Regions:
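Extended beta-strand/beta-hairpin segments
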Residues: 1-60, 71-80
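Mid-length scaffold segments of soluble, non-membrane domains
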Residues: 61-66
Length: 80
């Protein structure tokens, strides 16, 4: 069975506020192949809209799995 991992990194800059409404939710996901994704909380929870949020990532991962399964079946059946 395959193993997968990722590193999630966040830091609080010196002198930055750490209040619920204002702390920076920006962080990075780093994968084994070196890919880095700029992430944040969802905008509804004070995140940055221009970054990927965990809710979007779950949807994208699920859609990717479904697509790849469909394509694998189509390829095995030699459908074009």
């Amino acid at each position: 069975m395959s193993e997968y991992g990722a590193t999630v990194a966040w830091h609080l800059p010196p002198q930055a506020s750490f209040d619920y409404e204002t702390f920076d939710r920006s962080h990075e996901w780093t994968f084994a192949g070196g890919e880095v994704v700029q992430a944040s909380g969802s905008p509804e929870y004070f995140g940055t809209a221009s970054r990927v949020n965990p809710d979007e990532a779950v949807i994208a991962a699920t859609a990717s799995c479904h697509m790849l399964t469909f394509l694998s079946i189509a390829a095995k059946k030699r459908l074009r």
